Amino acid sequence: MRGGLTAFLLVAALAPVPAAPAPEPVVASVEVATRAPNNPRAKFWYRLPRGHDPARRERWRVLVLFGGRNCDGRPEVSGKLGWAAWADLNGVVLVAPTFRDDAYWEPRAWSGRALLDALAVLAARFGTSPRGLLFYGYSAGSQAANLFPAWRPDLCRAWVSHACGVFHEPSAGMRGVAGLVTCGDADAARYVLSRRFVDLCRARGVPVAWRSFPNRPHDVPEASALGLARAFFGAVASGAPCACWGEDGTWRVLERERIDPEYRSPLYTPALAELWRRPR
């Protein structure tokens, strides 16, 4: 009997211990003080991805999301437009502000400093990286999504603006920051402004990718615009050098030298190029 008990205990001791379940996503917020009259305490919602481990050695990349004008921020990090699932897959922390007016899309006045303060809090708590930032915005949020990177290009890796009506002045400082501009061609006024900005960037040596969507009004098509944005961030964040180029308008993927500079979209990877060529 004693031998049987000993054998049982030995087998039990050697049995593999079930792995602890991966931590669930966490959605919460931090607040920072500002001097803006309508934003004395600016709130920033954040979402830690599924399986997050603050003790890991590699710092978490951050994607800053700007929704429509005066958006709450919480829906943006909680799954709106599909960013939560993408963040889980790629190990990205989502951050979205709750700004109210005070020209918050202009970062030089006050909102840029507020964002940096919030990111510093998250870096101290969770090990997020204050550099290599990604920015995405649509409609009014698309203004902030390109104006913030232009304010501090040294902190930004890539940005995407969809259906935008206000852009920054292209400068040499943005040459190392990847950008993607998208718009529905039925969103006539924003389409013209977006295309004019892309032309100006390329004339000044700032590479920006462009994609329009036929017969799309002022909306955010999930499968095409958002799918392309997510693939763009993934390709750029991989660190791969740009290996593919597309020709605006014909949507053909060609050798770089065969495309006139004014129509040349940097597409980085074959997977991104295929999605750009035939957006789903």
Model-flagged regions — what are they?
Residues 157-230:
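The feature captures the conserved acid-bearing segment of alpha/beta-hydrolase catalytic domains
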Residues 62-66, 93-98, 132-137, 157-162, ...:
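Structural recognition of the beta-strand scaffold that forms the well-ordered cores
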Residues 50-59, 104-140, 150-153:
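Gly/Ser-rich "nucleophile elbow"/oxyanion-hole loop immediately N-terminal to the catalytic nucleophile
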Residues 52-104, 188-191:
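Short substrate-entry loop that stabilizes the transition state in hydrolases
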Residues 4-15:
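Bacterial N-terminal signal peptides
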Residues 65-71, 123-126, 138, 145, ...:
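Cell-envelope and extracellular/periplasmic
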Residues 57-58, 73-78, 106-108, 147, ...:
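Short, solvent-exposed loop/turn and secondary-structure capping segments
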Residues 17-62, 110, 136-148, 199, ...:
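A domain-start/cap signature at the N-terminus of enzymes
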